[in-house]
């Protein structure tokens, strides 16, 4: 199982956000929809975790087996 850092305060009302990985530090995170910077290193070099499904909710992440780390 992989850890996902979830930036709760940045998500929309239904806890939906963009699931991205930073190409510089490797961090996997759920950030605000349309976010452009890594929450760890502030790099703007982000890539979708899944090109076919950029937006996820916290329950969807849990159902997929991810470990949620709230930030």
Over which residues does each language-model region extend?
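Short, intrinsically disordered terminal segments enriched in charged and Pro/Gly residues
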Residues: 1-18, 47-71
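Short, flexible, glycine/charge-rich loop motifs used to bind or transfer phosphoryl groups or to couple energy/partner
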Residues: 11, 27-28
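Residues immediately within or flanking Cys/His clusters that coordinate Zn2+
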Residues: 17-19, 35-38
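Short cysteine-rich clusters marking metal-coordination/redox-active sites
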Residues: 22-25, 38-41
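Cys/His-rich microdomains that often coordinate metals
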Residues: 29, 45
